[in-house]
């Protein structure tokens, strides 16, 4: 089962938690769900170059709090915060509520599955050889502390007549073990020959205690220098 299911969905409530954190009555649930989908789609399309890993949406009473995890926060914030203010106003219009925006910097994008998948997809669109792109990503992840990584590329790779799937793995990626911290990300490369899919699994170690936000804590943990490894920019 672990081979087929989304590793993040399998671990929800164990060492992962939801990216949308709010409660709504049945009458409001559908509208808020579609709002969340629209917000994520807009942010990912508008900030394609900002290497966004995930967008977390929380809804305190009649408000909306959006947290964006990005490897390039400067592209989101803009000169003197002009771009982030423009984005905040747009999100306020979409939600019809007072919206605050937090930007969290990812200091090790080389071991973030979503960012790795996006990077490989962009390379495929630039006609970089898929094996070279996969191998480079695997080597970078293992060098920066990943315990294992697997990458799948599928489609008309290299312009081949028949679509196929190629994969590359290094280290171990235990998909059945619930205590393992496995990050998972996907991306699509729109090439001249059609769409190629990219899937990435990154094993970052084991989380032994029960903690639904343990994986999130790891992404904002203190670095070796003693200072916070993630920089936050808050705009209310």
Swiss-Prot record:
NCBIfam families: rpsC_bact (TIGR01009)
Subunit structure: Part of the 30S ribosomal subunit. Forms a tight complex with proteins S10 and S14.
Function (record text): Binds the lower part of the 30S subunit head. Binds mRNA in the 70S ribosome, positioning it for translation.
Domain of life: Bacteria
Keyword terms of this UniProt record: Ribonucleoprotein, Ribosomal protein, RNA-binding, rRNA-binding
KH type-2 domain ranges (all copies): 39-107
Protein name: Small ribosomal subunit protein uS3
A GO molecular-function annotation: structural constituent of ribosome
Stored CDD domains: KH-II_30S_S3
InterPro entries per UniProt: KH_dom, KH_dom-like_a/b, KH_dom_type_2, KH_sf_prok-type, Ribosomal_S3_C_sf, Ribosomal_uS3_bac-typ, Ribosomal_uS3_C, Ribosomal_uS3_CS
Gene transcribed to yield this protein: rpsC
Annotated family: Belongs to the universal ribosomal protein uS3 family.
Lineage, top ranks: Bacteria, Pseudomonadati, Pseudomonadota, Alphaproteobacteria, Hyphomicrobiales
One GO CC term on file: cytosolic small ribosomal subunit
Family matches, as Pfam families: KH_2, Ribosomal_S3_C
Gene Ontology terms describing biological process: translation
């Amino acid at each position: 089962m672990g081979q087929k299911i989304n590793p993040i969905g399998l671990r929800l409530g164990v060492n992962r938690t939801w990216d949308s954190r709010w409660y709504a009555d049945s009458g409001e649930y559908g509208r808020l769900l579609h709002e969340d989908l629209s917000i994520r789609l807009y942010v990912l399309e508008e900030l394609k170059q900002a290497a966004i890993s995930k967008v977390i949406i929380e809804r305190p009473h009649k408000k909306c709090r959006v947290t964006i995890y990005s490897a390039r926060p400067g592209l989101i914030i803009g000169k003197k915060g002009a771009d982030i203010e423009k984005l905040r106003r747009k999100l306020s219009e979409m939600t019809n509520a007072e919206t605050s925006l937090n930007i969290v910097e990812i200091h090790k994008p080389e071991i973030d599955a979503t960012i790795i998948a996006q990077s490989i997809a962009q390379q495929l669109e630039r006609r970089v050889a898929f094996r070279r792109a996969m191998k480079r990503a695997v080597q970078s992840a293992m060098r920066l502390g990943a315990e294992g990584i697997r990458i799948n590329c599928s489609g008309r790779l290299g312009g081949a007549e028949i679509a196929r799937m190629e994969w590359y793995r290094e280290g171990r990626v235990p998909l059945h073990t619930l205590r393992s911290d496995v990050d998972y990300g996907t991306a699509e490369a729109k090439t001249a020959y059609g769409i190629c899919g990219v899937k990435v699994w990154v094993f970052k170690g084991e989380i032994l205690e029960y903690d639904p936000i343990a994986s999130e804590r790891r992404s904002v943990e203190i670095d070796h220098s003693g200072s916070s490894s993630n920089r936050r920019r808050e705009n209310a």
